[in-house]
Regions:
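Register position in tetratricopeptide repeats
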Residues: 280, 313-314, 346-347, 380, ...
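Structural marker of alpha-solenoid helical repeat scaffolds
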Residues: 262-263, 296-297, 329-330, 362-363, ...
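Terminal, low-structured helical/coil segments at or just beyond the last alpha-helical repeat
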Residues: 487-516
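Start-of-helix register in tetratricopeptide repeats
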Residues: 269, 302, 335-336, 369, ...
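Canonical tetratricopeptide repeat
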Residues: 273, 306, 339-340, 373, ...
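Residue-level recognition of tetratricopeptide repeat
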Residues: 276, 309, 342, 376, ...
């Protein structure tokens, strides 16, 4: 004590020695990077936040406990499917531990035809310093640093051993102080495992407002240097799991089965997630079962469409048509679903398909869309010239419309009405559609009809390099390769296409592009 007291003194922040939050996350994509990932996460909390989980550990209401744990894990992973979870509190250490296991969708991006991963779930990626000091009256007020906090996170990402070489981009190490916060990260990549160890620790109570511009620049620079991965072109895609390779899907399928088994009697979510997984990996019979289970719980138009698409792939056209009709009865916007029209045509009911378009023309908000739909069904009905004339009439009004140009090119190709003038239309469609894969595919068909097989093949190679999941182009490329005498390569394309999208084969047979 001092006579007369003492002035205020600045109290320096003492960095915490024990993490408030320590997370160990394991993401298993050893089966393939284009598949859902199995996650295992352990989260340890200390201090005040741990006390809340102490109370949660004592709650007997399993649903309430699971909901809370789902939200806790979501704060790290975002959307996920929780299969198993637990919470425990150690009184002696004061540490709460949450453990969870489940599935996340594949976070790899294939937007430019190269699979890349901006590695998610990094603590540093969520660091920000967005503070408004634009108003003059508060411009000089110091900015409070979030804290005191101390986070530790370890991420282990398992990769396929036979998925080709993975390239690590970005910084392999970060060790800097930004805005009064210490950010440390180290990254390593083995052939089939990515490991990241992070720490985020506050060191100061506040920073001067004048430092904000530098802090924002440093934050942006740091985030742009965070590690990311690039896969090679040999990486297996989800539609390539056929034959013996399907055994690799087993661990993921087991988690989906667990989610379905634990679902409430009126819940559809678990069935729909499994439907998507099965459909995308070529298990259309399993997908149909899941869609049927979803319909039994929620007879929505979307669920009927799901089952219709599975039935279509299984060549059950009557079932597919019934489900498309059921979806349209619930939601009239689905009345003119393209695959419904195709199904009618393949069943030999082309007059019904034409009548359906004519009788429901009021559903088209734009006349050009009606012209495109009519041209398609008229072609199936043996009236292709009439349909193409309708497209030309619309093009006279909108000569640069990419959709109309592509429809004229495509319909001329599938119904064998291609001329040299058609090819000019196809090239304009490619130009107006900014070289879209769909327009290039249409031009390839026109080139094929003209016997210009090498040019058609070049176009199709471009399409499938950009959009490897556009399986209809594989059917067409198989036809082109056969015309060039490259039978083995044609069979390879057909094998992939028939596994991934067997339903499309019926159309290519109807158009004379594929043998029965």
């Amino acid at each position: 004590l001092r006579p007369g007291g003492a002035d205020l003194r600045e109290m320096a922040m003492r960095p915490q020695a024990i993490p408030d939050e320590a997370i160990v996350l394991r993401v298993d994509q050893s089966a393939g990077i284009d598949l859902p990932a199995i996650y295992d996460i352990t989260m340890e909390f200390s201090g005040a936040s741990a006390r809340g989980y102490q109370a949660l550990s004592l709650i007997e209401d399993a649903d309430q406990k699971e909901d809370t744990l789902y939200r806790t894990v979501s704060a790290v992973l975002g959307d996920h499917q929780l299969a198993e979870s637990s919470v425990a509190f150690d009184v002696s250490s004061g540490i709460a531990t949450i453990a969870a296991r489940g599935l996340i969708g594949s976070p790899w991006d294939d937007g430019d035809a190269r699979l890349e991963l901006d590695v998610p779930f990094q603590s540093a990626d969520s660091f920000s310093f967005e503070v408004d000091r634009s108003r003059p009256e508060i411009a000089d007020i110091p900015v409070t640093v979030r804290g005191p906090v101390y986070y530790r996170r370890n991420i282990e990402w398992l990769l396929p051993e036979d998925g080709g070489e993975f390239r690590l981009l970005g910084a392999t190490g970060i060790n800097e102080v930004i805005g009064g916060t210490r950010l440390v990260s180290s990254t390593s990549l083995d052939p089939a495992k990515l490991q990241i160890a992070e720490e985020v620790q506050s060191l100061e109570w506040e920073v001067p407002a004048s430092a904000l511009p530098d802090i924002r620049r440093e934050t942006l620079r740091m985030k742009r240097s965070l590690p990311r991965l690039r896969a090679s072109r040999e990486a297996k895609r989800r539609w390539e799991y056929a034959g013996a390779e399907r055994s690799r899907l087993g661990p993921i399928a087991d988690v989906y089965d667990m989610l379905v088994a634990d679902a409430e009697s009126d819940e559809t979510g678990a069935y729909l997630y499994r439907f998507e997984f099965r459909y995308n990996t070529g298990d259309f019979a399993g997908a149909l079962e899941d869609a049927s289970a979803a319909i039994a719980r929620d007879a929505s138009a979307d669920n009927y469409l799901r089952r219709a698409s599975a039935a279509w792939q299984l060549d059950d056209l009557e079932q597919a048509l019934a489900d498309y009709e059921a979806a349209a009865d619930i939601d009239p916007d689905y009345t003119l679903h393209t695959t419904r029209l195709e199904t009618l045509a393949l069943l030999g009911r082309t007059e019904e398909a034409v009548a359906l378009v004519d009788e429901n023309a009021f559903l088209f908000e734009d006349p050009k869309n009606e012209a495109m739909s009519r041209s398609y069904v008229l072609g199936f009905a043996g009236q292709a010239d009439e349909g193409l004339d309708g497209l030309r009439d619309e093009l006279a009004i909108e000569p640069d419309d990419a959709g109309l140009l592509n429809s004229l090119c495509w319909d001329s190709g599938i119904f064998d009405r291609v001329t040299e003038e058609t090819l000019d239309v196809c090239t304009r469609a490619v130009e107006q559609a900014n070289n879209s894969a769909g327009a290039i595919d249409s031009r390839a068909l026109a080139l094929y009809r003209l016997g210009r097989y090498e040019e058609a093949l070049r176009d199709l190679d471009v399409v499938l390099a950009r959009e490897p999941g556009q399986h209809a182009s594989r059917y067409l490329r198989a036809a082109v390769k056969r015309a060039l005498g490259r039978e083995a390569e044609a069979r390879e394309d057909l094998s992939v296409a028939r596994h991934a999208a067997p339903g499309a084969a019926k159309l290519y047979e109807a158009w004379g592009l594929l043998e029965n």
